Design a protein with these regions (language model features):
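C-terminal beta-signal and adjacent terminal beta-strands/loops
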Residues: 39, 135, 154-203
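Short, P/G- and charge-enriched loop/turn segments at secondary-structure junctions
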Residues: 2-6, 18, 59, 103, ...
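Gram-negative outer-membrane beta-barrel transporters
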Residues: 34-37, 57-139, 156, 171
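Membrane-embedded beta-barrel scaffold of Gram-negative outer-membrane proteins
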Residues: 6-61, 65-67, 178
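Residues on the lipid-exposed face of transmembrane beta-strands in outer-membrane beta-barrel proteins
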Residues: 17-21, 71-75, 85, 115-119, ...
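Residues that define the transmembrane beta-barrel architecture of outer-membrane proteins
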Residues: 11-15, 63-67, 109-113, 145-149, ...
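Repeated loop/turn-to-beta-strand initiation elements of outer-membrane beta-barrel proteins
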Residues: 25-29, 80-83, 123-127, 159-165, ...
């Protein structure tokens, strides 16, 4: 990664609108929409656009438009268990002043999903959830979609002290969240199955 001393600050406008409601004691719904227009938007760029393995730097995109929406729902099964899910759609377009106008940024998967089940009782918290995406451009991704599972477990020892264990990508899926393919493999792959154990103290 190489720095860029000529980097300019982003300027622009962002609009958001949303609505959250609780239908009853068990169901919560939410929907949000957003739109932004930025000048000198900051993004990563390969020094050699034809070689994703070349050095990268942060650079200003002339103009960027981003629009999208998110829908989420939570359903309380019992006092201890609940399920939740969300869907996010995002579209990013950029104009690099190359005479071609705005073009879609295909490094971003347009459809993103999350669904999980949570357990909360006394000092215990646990969550198992799946994360996925679809609609990715196969010129930038090995596969247009992916799905992976994560697990977290937490125990509150005291008011300000807790211990936790987390497992990521339980399915050991091969996937990426940022576009880039070289010789049929992801240039920026996400980690395979991994585990984390830790503690947290608040003061």
């Amino acid at each position: 990664m190489i720095g860029n001393a000529k980097l300019k600050p982003e300027t622009g406008e962002v609009w958001t609108i949303g609505y959250d409601t609780k239908l009853n004691d068990k169901i919560q719904l939410g929907i949000n929409a957003f739109y932004s227009e930025l000048d000198d938007a900051i993004n990563w760029a390969a020094l050699d656009p034809n070689n994703f393995l070349s050095d990268w730097t942060v650079a200003n995109v002339a103009k960027q438009k981003k629009r999208g929406m998110e829908f989420n729902v939570k359903y309380k099964l019992t006092d201890e268990f609940s399920i939740n899910g969300s869907y996010t759609y995002v579209k990013v377009e950029e104009d690099n002043k190359d005479g071609n106008g705005f073009k879609r940024n295909t490094n971003v998967s347009p459809n993103q999903y999350k669904i999980g089940i949570s357990f909360n009782k006394d000092k215990w918290d646990a969550e198992l959830y799946g994360r996925g995406a679809s609609g990715a451009d196969k010129s930038k991704y090995v596969d247009s979609k992916y799905l992976t599972l994560d697990l977290s477990l937490q125990y509150k020892v005291q008011k300000d002290y807790k211990i936790y264990a987390k497992a990521y990508n339980l399915t050991n899926a091969s996937y990426a969240e940022t576009g880039g393919v070289s010789n049929g493999k992801y240039s920026f792959p996400m980690p395979g199955r991994s585990f984390l154990i830790g503690m947290e103290y608040a003061f």
